[in-house]
């Protein structure tokens, strides 16, 4: 099983994001060791470097859609609620596929959002540790063209580093939690 930090950024022309229509403008991923340490560099695929959203998706498909579902296990935050759903819908849009949510049933995924919700005992604010800004500045940077590209990249790198730090902490703490749960089950 090869875990990869995984995230996307999208451009929404309207005030609120629309996962069914918003264009994917970046896909970023980084291989992780079993304890969450980065292996290799953060890969940032951008719509502007690839030439189009469709070309971006074609490039990522070579890494993501292999014959072995364990070759790329996405690890991230809110993957089922946003990133993977957006990816699925944009693949359907560009390639005429009709994949439903069942497309991901056999795909191993580690989404840490439920863990952070349980830890904070609420949904509101569970993504705060990643430094998400509200309103999201990605839209403005993207719309400013070439001048905003480096700001997008810097934001992505910071968010990736924060996520990896949180993941490493969780991977350290969860075995201790498991020991505590085993004591509860035994008694």
Language model features: what each stretch is:
Residues 23-28, 39-40, 71-187:
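Metal-dependent phosphoesterase core characteristic of DEDDh/y 3'-5' exonuclease domains
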């Amino acid at each position: 099983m090869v875990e990869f930090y995984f995230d996307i950024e999208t451009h929404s022309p309207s005030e609120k994001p629309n996962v069914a229509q918003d264009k994917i403008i970046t896909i970023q991923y980084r291989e992780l060791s079993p304890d969450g340490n980065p292996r290799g560099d953060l890969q940032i695929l951008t719509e502007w470097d690839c030439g189009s959203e469709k070309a971006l998706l074609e490039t990522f498909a070579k890494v993501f859609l292999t014959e072995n579902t364990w070759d790329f296990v996405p690890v991230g935050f809110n993957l089922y609620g946003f990133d993977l759903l957006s990816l699925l819908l944009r693949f359907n849009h560009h390639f005429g596929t009709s994949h439903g949510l069942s497309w991901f049933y056999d795909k191993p995924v580690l989404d840490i959002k439920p863990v952070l919700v349980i830890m904070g005992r609420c949904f509101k604010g569970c993504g705060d540790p990643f430094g998400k800004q509200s309103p999201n500045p990605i839209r403005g940077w993207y719309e400013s063209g070439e001048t905003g590209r480096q700001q997008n990249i810097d934001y992505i790198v910071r968010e990736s580093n924060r996520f990896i730090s949180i993941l490493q902490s969780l991977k350290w703490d969860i075995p201790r939690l498991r020991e505590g749960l085993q004591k509860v089950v035994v008694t």
